[in-house]
Amino acid sequence: MAKTNSINNAAYDQLNKDADRILQLIKVQMDNLTLPQCPLYEEVLDTQMFGLQKEVDFAANLGLIDIEMGKEIMLRLEKELSKLHEAFTNV
C-alpha cells in the first residue's frame, strides 16, 4: 500500500512539474520571443497543453491519480497562463 501511494505521489508530482515547465516556457517566450497573438506562440501553447492533458489522462486511466486531481492541475495551469497573458497584454 505504501508503494502504491509513493507511485501515485510521484505521478502527481511529475504532472505538476510538467505543468510548471509549460508555464516557465510560456513566460520565457512572452518575455523574449513573441506576442501572445503570434501563431507560433499559440501553436506551442496548444501543443504543450494537449500533451499535458494526455499525460493526465494516461495517469488517471492507470489509476495513478484521481481524475479530479488531474483536472485541478489543468485548471491551475490555465489560470496561471491567463494571468500571465493578461499581465503581458496590459503592459
Curated annotation (Swiss-Prot):
Residues spanning the signal sequence: none
Family stated for the protein in its record: Belongs to the UPF0358 family.
Pfam families xrefs: DUF1507
Name of the protein: UPF0358 protein Sca_0738
Organism: Staphylococcus carnosus (strain TM300)
NCBIfam families: PRK13666.1 (NF010187)
